[in-house]
Amino acid sequence: MKVSDFDYSLPEERIAKYPPDNRGATRLLVLNRHTGSVQHARYSNLEAFLGYGDLLVINTTKVVRARLFAVKQTGAAIELMLLEKHEGPQNLALYRGRLKKGDRLLAHGHELIVEELAGQGVARLSVEGIESVHALFQNHAEVPIPPYLKRDAEAVDRERYQTVFAEHPGSVAAPTASLNMTPELLLKLEKGGVATAVMTLHVGLGTFLPIRTETMEEHVMHREFYSIPARTIEQIHETRRSGGRVVALGTTVTRALEHAATRISAFSGSDPLVGEADIFIHPGYSFQTIDALLTNFHAPRSTVLMLTAAFAGADHLRAAYREAVEKRYDFLSYGDSMLIS
């Protein structure tokens, strides 16, 4: 299939530039992937669409401070996005501006050196005057909100661009399907017999890289580290046996569970399943682990839109997106949600 098949017109005013005043005070579009029928609800009423015995799987990753501004010796400003969290002598970073090998950048009294240009707007950096590039970013960088918000990070983003269950640092972007979730709603779901299971996938480089190929088959997917605890796998098996549904809270959870599907089915150990998800899910894919997906409204031509289309059915999703635009739903990270089942 062509990447252009997943283009659509998204009016600028439909992109939520800020989070709602109250977390979770958003709308919910409910799509039946078998019939294409649509219902409109409030996110706070999610429990009406999940049932006793269902299992909601959440991503406990935490967004790290990864966005830093530096200045070249010429005075030109360079924006950097850290792509690795290790504390080795060099780190990869996405950059905005013009760089060449050997350039020296000043940031908060320290010099960053461009050791190598790795392609696709990525540079390998070292630093002088501090123990590591990672340490410089952790001391001085800010939370990397998405570029399509077209603004600098503000105080509100420090809280609201993290999920309420963020625990394990490592992501350069939030698992945005979780941004609307609240402790109160999780408690309502629990009282209704919906269990919660945890896992971690660190959102990485691919979130910021566009698809540059004409066909999906040519696209090489990025890798993202994940860890699925043994208890979560046990809960998945228990849910299957009892006839409940495995509900993925977001595309990050979906990628991890589907990448590990074969190992989950055969699992009998006590250690977590770890891996690097490089699976590119698009229409034609046969889902093995999840039964429902709670997600955002995604950007045109994005890999997460293609994953959602694979689960919902491309025609059903196109129709639902058209209706969402017409009914003035808010799109992207800080926007409304949809439940597909």
From Swiss-Prot:
It catalyses: 7-aminomethyl-7-carbaguanosine(34) in tRNA + S-adenosyl-L-methionine = epoxyqueuosine(34) in tRNA + adenine + L-methionine + 2 H(+). The keyword Isomerase does not apply. InterPro entries: QueA, QueA_dom1, QueA_dom2, QueA_sf. SUPFAM superfamilies: QueA-like. One of its GO terms (biological process) is tRNA wobble guanine modification. Pathway: tRNA modification; tRNA-queuosine biosynthesis. NCBIfam families: PRK00147.1, queA. HAMAP family: QueA (MF_00113). This is S-adenosylmethionine:tRNA ribosyltransferase-isomerase. It comes from Chlorobium phaeovibrioides (strain DSM 265 / 1930).
